[in-house]
Amino acid sequence: MVHNKGGIHMWKRFVAIGDSFTEGIGDEVEGIALKSWVDHFVQLCVNDIEYANFAKRGLVTKEIRSQQLEKALTFNPDLVSLIAGANDVLKGRWNHYAYKEDMKCMIDTLSKTGADIMIANLPDFTVRLPFSTEKKQVLKEQLLEANEVILSLSREHQLHHIDFWNHQLVNDNTLWSKDFIHPNSKGYVKVAELIFSSLPVHDASK
């Protein structure tokens, strides 16, 4: 169930940047059409909201910064979603300092527009991936490093922070595709509901 306290979201222009998690690739299940969580999120909003999803599969954070940040600014959003870092880890290109620099640059730039920014830590992919214990441990440590950066920046800039790492959906295999990395069509619905219910709302009665 989505709890929105009877209010409506106040935003009018929403833009999402990121990788395949936000683009919305994965398996279609239970007759639920495969859509990005972004599409489901907008459908949950009571008010009319224009939106653009610039996320693209396979990109590391540096590429998201170089290819999508300017597009996001041009859209003139009042709400931005930034979820990045999974490919840095999964493609073996993890660099703590480069990741922090790229994320900080994007958040600093977006913050100057006055837009609200929502950011999410990365889920623990290692619970499903068929890797050795040693490789899983390395990946998990890198994911935790990324999440430390995300949480630190979230606190510093007072961002809307969504906690995927500790949410129960991570351990629900019915919500994930056969590649063990991407949500399936049902999973994207749940992701949208989690993000929607995590955001503050405007009380329409006031």
Question: At which residue positions do the language-model features occur?
Answer:
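Short loop/turn segments at beta->alpha junctions
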Residues: 60-61, 95
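Serine-esterase "nucleophile elbow" of acetyl-processing enzymes
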Residues: 3-57, 67-76
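Alpha-helical cap/lid subdomain in secreted, periplasmic
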Residues: 66-206
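Short, Lys/Arg-enriched, disordered terminal segments
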Residues: 1-13, 105, 200-206
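Gly/Ser/Thr-rich beta-alpha loop segments that engage phosphate groups in nucleotides
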Residues: 20, 26, 60, 87, ...
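Cell-envelope and extracellular/periplasmic
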Residues: 55-59, 84-85
